[in-house]
Amino acid sequence: MADSPLEQGWNVVTWALSGSYDEDRPVLIDADQPNRSLSKKQAIDLVARLSGSFQPGSTVCVHLYNDIIYPVLVLAILASHCEWTGTNPAYTSAELSHHFAQSETRYVITDQAYVDVVHQAITASGQNIEIIIFSDIVTDKPGENDLRWRCNKYDLATLHSLLTHGDESTLRRRLQGIPNHSPATAMSTSGTTGLPKMVQRSHRSLVLETGGTQDHNSAKPFQVRRLYCTPIFHAFSFPEMVINTIRLGFPSFYMRRFDESFANKVHEFGITETMAAPAMLLKIIQWTEKHEEQRFKLQGLRTILCAGAALASRLRASFLQLFDDASVRIVQVWGMTEGGWFATFWYPEHDDTGSIGRPLPTCQIRVSEVPHAELPDGRQVGELLVKGPQLLTTYKGHPDATKQAFNDGWLRTGDIGYCANGKVYIIDRAKDIIKVNGWTISPAELEAVLHQMPVIVDAAALSYGTGTKEHVAMFVVAKEPSMLIADIKHHLLQQVARFKVATCEIHLVDSLPRNSSGKILRGVLRHQLQAHYGNGDHGID
């Protein structure tokens, strides 16, 4: 195999299986059942035996939680000359139906627990989609009854029924026929500007990305042992959980989902690195406040990769205070579904300036020539634009949207920020910026100010109203239900210019709606206001 991700002939499967290390050592490990694991050799065997199970050119959807089989399924799908797409197990039938239609799904692999919802979605989509039931091909030896799953109205094939007698030589022959420019994945956008679209990326795109994200592991004074609990189908998690883990060969433990057992697993398995969204860091802090022993169990962590939403400086500082070792790093990752990771920091760099990273080797990042706002220090900020070979090929079935996403070959990210000293800084999302009487206000700035108050657990700021009635609306989660809105507004007036918050309205709530990656769903909050006030032009005292 070639030794560079820039080699033109690479496909994702060849690249993922190209690492050189002890192939009998467990690499993919079930965090709930650590005896259930896969070595590289076992993973290759399963990929070889599953490859060819799907009609070439088809899209195969994996509708499952995190599992050590998931990377194997993705590689087997790609080795079959097919395209992978993944969905959130929490999706409703309506969400699944839309995803199936947009991705042109032909097969869906799912668990028995989700088969009813999947069947409803297929019926609603009107498509001819075959359901394949997840069966544990890691530990279960197939019997005659394991090849089909029969229950009530269902009689469906299982993963066991797909296993053939293929071997590594068969697999290599299949892989030779995969052009590196061919489609590999179809990932769903967040749908913040309409219904979710499918981002189609090529094999070459993913190979370049995962080659660029590789950290300086050999320079680390600790063994890399990863714990994964972020959604594997997400663009933040996918390159590491599916490709780089098996390529680089460090022990990786997969949690089905993030829960309160996190600290116990960090301690039990000697975990040194993990991935998280900011909302997860907040949860961990809250758990340690209730159970001091959880703080002790986290001490082995050395690196936390963080993405999915803006990381407030106060939250970052509070999380780092959990550790006795000052060398613990929270490393931000910035990217989009449209191209994966764009910027991050590599070991051993620390950053306390608020930057979200340095550009990946395959990414060019610049600021739009049209300034969007001005910072207090006079610095002009604008929309961040990205260019490079790892970007999407197209929005599947939406050529016009693809054209609109680019400006002279540069992807419009929708993030407002600036670049300085080789680092990238994000101020806010363009669509979230608030305009009050002609003044530009950043929701992230107001949220950061509120997070300075010890009694504030979570906060969200958004624009509400139109024209001269546009103003700031803030939703606040407080530790003390008796927290006075007047105290919150007083704090804001002490910290920011009066024009930013003089007309703001504040709502105390029990929690904030967030998506699977931790982003605040401002549209849901805005809908709640509309339901209560109408069009928002009700006036503020």
UniProtKB/Swiss-Prot annotation:
Its EC number is 6.2.1.-. The keyword Aminoacyl-tRNA synthetase does not apply. Pfam families: AMP-binding (PF00501), AMP-binding_C (PF13193). Residues 445-519 are annotated as: AMP-binding. AMP binds at A186, M187, S188, T189, S190, G191, T192, T193, G194, L195, P196, K197. GO terms for biological process: secondary metabolic process. GO terms for molecular function: ATP binding; CoA-ligase activity. Keywords: ATP-binding, Ligase, Nucleotide-binding. It comes from the Eukaryota. It is an enzyme of class 6 (ligase). Transmembrane segments: none annotated. Pathway: Secondary metabolite biosynthesis. PANTHER family: ADENYLATE-FORMING ENZYME AFEA, LONG-CHAIN-FATTY-ACID--COA LIGASE. Belongs to the ATP-dependent AMP-binding enzyme family. Acyl-CoA ligase; part of the gene cluster that mediates the biosynthesis of squalestatin S1 (SQS1, also known as zaragozic acid A), a heavily oxidized fungal polyketide that offers potent cholesterol lowering activity by targeting squalene synthase (SS). SQS1 is composed of a 2,8-dioxobicyclic[3.2.1]octane-3,4,5-tricarboxyclic acid core that is connected to two lipophilic polyketide arms. This is Acyl-CoA ligase M9.
